[in-house]
Every structure is written in C-alpha cells, then in structure tokens.
Amino acid sequence: MQEILSAVDAELFGVWFLIGAALVFWMQAGFAMVETGFTRAKNSGNIIMKNLMDFCIGTVMFVLIGFSFLLGEDLLGFIGKPGFDIFTAYKDFNFSSFVFNLVFCATTATIVSGAMAERTKFLSYCVYSAVISALIYPIEAHWIWGGGWLAQLGFHDFAGSCCIHMVGGISALIGAKILGPRIGKFEKDANGKVIKVNAFPGHNIPLGALGVFILWFGWYGFNGAAATTIEDLGSIFLTTTVAPAVATVTCMIFTWIRYGKPDVSMCLNASLAGLVGITAPCDVTDAFGATMIGIVSGLLVVFGVWLLDYKLHVDDPVGAVAVHMMNGIWGTIAVGLFATSLAPGYAIALEGGSIKGEGLFYGGGFTQLGLQLLGFVSVAAWAAVCMVIVFTVIKATIGLRASKEEEIRGLDIMEHGLSSAYAGFEFGGMDFVDGDADVIGSESMEASVPALVKTSDAGDGKKITKVEILMKQERFERFKKAMNDIGVTGMTVTQVLGCGTQKGAPEYYRGVPMDIQLLPKTQVEMVISSVPVMDVINATRKALYTGHIGDGKIFVYDVEDVVKVRTGESGYDALQGEDD
C-alpha cells in the first residue's frame, strides 16, 4: 500500500512540476507588461517583440547546446558534456526537465532587456540574448543545479536568486553602462559632470502593475515547482507570499516618509524585489526569515534605484538592476543567515547535499554563509567577465545602440515600422465626471481678488470676443451648465495636458524630482458677441472655483472677424443661428 501511495505521490508532483514550468513561462508576459508600462509609449512594440524573441531565440539555443551544457554529464565540475540526446535518444529523454530548465533560462535573458530599454538595437538584443541562453546561463547553472562544483560543496540556491536573477541583473548593469543613458536622462556641465537627473515616467503604470501581479502569480511556480512534499510546497508558498508583501509595505512607508507620498512604481518594484530575495532560501527558511528578507528587499530596491541614478549614473528605466542584481545577491546571502531546520525543505536539502548547515542567525555559524558568499562571488565574476566581452564585441561590430534619430522618434516606428502600439486610441482622452464632490478650499471666492477685464458688451459695434478656459476635467459638467444658464451654448472642447509646479512642493518619480508634470486638463474655447464677457467670466469662476491650486485660467482675446463657411456671413451675424 505504501508503495502505491508513493507512486501516486510521485505522479502528482510530476504533474505539478510541469504546471510550475507553465507558470514560469507565463511570467514572460509579466516581464513584458512591466517593461512596457515603465517605459514610453513610442517603444512599446519594440519591448513586446524583444520579450517574445528572447524566449523563442532562447529555446532554439537551449535545444542546440544550452541544455547539454547545463544538465549533461559533468566535466570537472565546470560544464555539462555537449550532446544531442534530444535528437538522438528522444525516447529516453527527460522531457519535463528540459521544459522546466528552458523556461528558467528564458527568464535570465529577459531581465536584461528592461535596463537597456528604449535605446538598444533590436539585432544586437537578439545576439546577446542568444549568447546568454546558449553559454552564459547554462554553464553557471550547471555549477549549481547540474552537479557542478558549487553543488558538490553544498551551495544552496533553490529557485534562482543567484543563477537567474543575479546573473540577469549583472548583465543588465553592464549592458546599461556600456550602452549609455537615454537622451536627456542626465544633464552635464561643461566638464562632463552630471548636475541633474531627469525623470522619465512610464506611460502606463496600470500595465506595469498588471505585469507585477502576473509575475507574483507565476512565482508560485517559479519557487514551488521543484517541491517534493505537500509540507515543503506549503512552506514555499508561505515564504513566497510573506517576503514580497513585507517588502512592498516597507517600501511604501519609506517612500512616504522620504518623498512625502508613497511611490507607486517603486512599490511595484519592491514586490518583485521581495520575490527575488526569497527565491534562493524559500524552501529552507521560516516566516521570520521571510519577513526579515522582505524588509531588507524593500529598502534595498529604493537604495538601488537612487544609487544608479545619483552615484553610478546608469540609466535603468525599469529598475532591473535594483530588483534583480541587488536582491539576487541579497537572497543568495540570506540562505546563510536564515536557513533553519524548522523549514520542511531543510531536511530534504540536507539529505540531498544542497545545504551544509543552518544559517548564522539560527545557530549554524559561518559555514553555510561562507559557501553562499563563495558562490555569489564566483557566479558574479563569471557573468561580469562574459557580458563585458559580449557587449564590447557587439558594440565594436554590429553596434549596440540605436541611432539618435531612432531613439528620438521611437524604436516602434524605426525598428519595426509600427506607427503606434496603441493604434485607434488617443492619448489623454478621458470621460467627464461631475465635480460636485470636490472639496472646496478654505478661502471663499468672494474674498479672492476680483476679476477686472477691459472690454465692452456687444452693442452697435457688435464687439466679438474669444474666451479660452483651462480647467480641471472633473469641473466641466458644472461649467457647461453654468454657460447654458447665461445663454452660451457654442463651445469647442479639447482634452489637453498641462503643467504647473507649486513652488516648494515638487513631485517625485522613483525618487527623482519632476520639474514638469503634465496633468490631464480640459480646454474650452468660446467666441461670444451677445453675452457680456464679464457674465461669462463670473459664471466660469463660480463654476470652477475650489480655492485649490489648479482651478484653472481664463484668457480673453479680441477677435477681428468671423466668417461662417456655409452662408458667407461675417462678424456678429456669423455667430447667430442654430448651427453655431
């Protein structure tokens, strides 16, 4: 009976193993959404194409050589023996292991694209993505997961903080540094010293948030697919939930205190940072360890973004280096600090030789911590040296960076002939909402400075005046009713973007002050002749006034003449009639 139960259990976890692989594949969509949302609209199609191709190209390279380098017969602890068993011995081939390791390989390659987004040549991206999938990832992953020298020592990286996220993050840092920043990101003085950092807000934060939720969902497969018992799987799910949640709360509190408001995009990065940090120790730590890992991850991602912007002057549009490299390193080290025999996966790892002892904070001393430090340094050195060579060769041959014209116009149109990834949609168009719920300012309208306009009512001279008004979108319905009440029914309404900064109260995007922040506004144009201008101004102020900054502005112009296209009437007469 026990043999039957064991067989059933093995079959169930075999199915779960493949489901986990499918979840990891689904994470490709999450990476695509995060990178697209955190960058500008003119490069959206290019980013989607890169995320598609790094998986497809990676699959080809992994089939040809990557898989054998990773899981082939061990050669001196460094590399798997090259072979073509997938073609020559398909009947006995380990299909599940191939698919599982393939989707992990693709994750490493896709991390790099975010840090190098918006200015990398598409051909160059395809080349270095292929190299990562064929050589760089499979070899170092063999050291850890393929029976290589780190695995033999007892280095522990259960799901890839080191061999996937840190390697992808290091590749991203080196690539972004060699590539250079986006045009306008850093302002320099005559001596070449950076004197100002400019914020480039992502064009679609909701899309980025969707990507984060997709990634978090996929991470349950990323971390949990290799679990072999129900208890182990449950513990992994717990730590994979606690760490990112704590990281996000930590980041929210810190940015709220530091910048005056909780930073949305930074908190989204913090969720991913917590997931990266828990990836290596997820099976061997407990809830306390996951909490501590999450706290550090939440702070580390903010520090990482600041460090790259203000000290290293490396342009990373999506925070890939702070999320993956820094937290990949942290997660690797965290095994040596928080591994505990209380976790169900610890005994499994100890029996399999993939861990040598508990963490420093659980009485295990420095044994495991030393192994983790050795592994992180070794893998980091391998990735750094290889990627410097790869990027340098690409830069010297086919070129790494897109031209200035391509970058300014956008890679969608220049690289792919895609005029817009959002064809059929107009940027900035929003539904009008009623503004009755607006909070009125402390200062009454009557106490404010009265409006004085040097104009006259339409009389014998039939004076024509143009009134242009910029207002908050939510006040439009109130304004429209006010105009109807005084007899003004003709107007042209446009959705626009406007800016205005209150002195001493700047806004921040990812810790960078924003000099100009464009906000959705409604612009109304009216040409009037029979209604007194002061009536229009007074009614407008009454409708728009809240006492807060940003209530709007009224512009008054003299109009020389008006001609009605249909009848040819001009002046005052052109403004009369049902079609005006």
Predicted region positions:
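Glycine- and aromatic-enriched membrane alpha-helices
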Residues: 1-458
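Positively charged, small/polar-rich N-terminal and surface patches that mediate targeting and assembly
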Residues: 414-421, 432-580
